[in-house]
Amino acid sequence: MNRSTKTWPIALQRIAERALGEQAGQSLWQKYRAAFSAEYRALVSPRYALKDMLNLERITSSNNQCISLLNPGRQVEHYRLHFYSRQPRYLDEYIPVLENMHLRVMDQVQFSITVDGITLFIKSFTIKAKSQCASFAKL
């Protein structure tokens, strides 16, 4: 186990406790701490994992789907778009919608998260806006 693998859960715990208060943060962390795979931990920072946990809690209690846009920082020109659902989803369900929004999909991955015997899914896309310059070049 490398250092980042060991520190990721601790960072998530601290972020959850800071954001939600010690008791609520600790409770949420305990519920999800073993739910995230090594692949998820490698791709998603603890800061965004908290956002994912809160959205997964929403769909668990409401039986709806939701989405979240994650901005990785100032020096990065792409975003991560997470779709949360109670069943696995396929690319053909998302690509037409993303293309209609003039978004370019750079990659995608689906995570399955099992918490309290319920499996939930996060479909994660790396996206960026398509350049509109080409359409204006003819003017």
Which stretches of residues belong to each language-model region?
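Non-catalytic interaction/regulatory segments
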Residues: 1-103, 109-139
